[in-house]
Amino acid sequence: MRGTGTHLIAKNRKAFFNYHVEDRLECGIALEGTEVKSVRAGHLSFPDAFAEMRGGELWLKNVHIAEYVHACSFAPNPDRMRKLLAHRDQIARLKRKVEEKGYTLVPLEFYLKAGRVKVALGICKGKKLFDKRAQIKARDNARELSRSLCERHH
C-alpha cells in the first residue's frame, strides 16, 4: 500500500513470520495529544497487536505507544484501544473476510503519509508450525549459499 512520499516508522516482522498475509488495507488511526510525536519518534511497540470489529468500527488493541518525554503532565493511557479510520465499505469487506474461519486483522506497519500516521492492516491467516520451520530452513539455506559464494570469491 505504501507509495512514494511515505516514511516507514515501524514494521511488525513477527506478523510476517506468524501469519500468511492475504490482503492489505491502509487505515488512518485516531491518536490523542502527544501520541503523534511519540509515534513519529518511533516509540511504539506492537508485536501482539490485532484489530477487531465493534459496532461497525475497527479498533486496534495491544499497541503500546510510549508517553512523549517532552510533554506536560497530561498523557493518554499508553495501552488504550485506538480507533482505526476506514471507509464503511472497506470495513464491511474486512468483516466478511474475518468471519471466515482462521482469519484475523494484524497491523503490519506504521508509516507517515503526507504528514499523517497510517497503519497497514493485514488480513492474515495463522501459519502452522511446519510452515514456520520450512521458512527458517529456507532462510538458513539461502544464508549458507551466500556465505559460500562470498568465501569462493575472496
Curated annotation (Swiss-Prot):
Entry's family note: Belongs to the SmpB family.
Domain of life: Bacteria
Summary of the function given for this chain in its UniProt record: Required for rescue of stalled ribosomes mediated by trans-translation. Binds to transfer-messenger RNA (tmRNA), required for stable association of tmRNA with ribosomes. tmRNA and SmpB together mimic tRNA shape, replacing the anticodon stem-loop with SmpB. tmRNA is encoded by the ssrA gene; the 2 termini fold to resemble tRNA(Ala) and it encodes a 'tag peptide', a short internal open reading frame. During trans-translation Ala-aminoacylated tmRNA acts like a tRNA, entering the A-site of stalled ribosomes, displacing the stalled mRNA.
Pfam families found in the cross-reference section: SmpB
Name of the protein: SsrA-binding protein
SUPFAM superfamilies given in the database record: Small protein B (SmpB)
Keyword Transmembrane helix: no
PROSITE patterns, A to Z: SSRP
Keyword set includes RNA-binding: yes
Places the protein is found: Cytoplasm
Main location: cytoplasm
Family annotation (InterPro entries): SmpB, SsrA-bd_prot, SsrA-bd_prot_CS
Record-level GO BP terms: trans-translation
GO CC list: cytosol
GO molecular function, one term: RNA binding
Keywords from the UniProt entry: Cytoplasm, RNA-binding
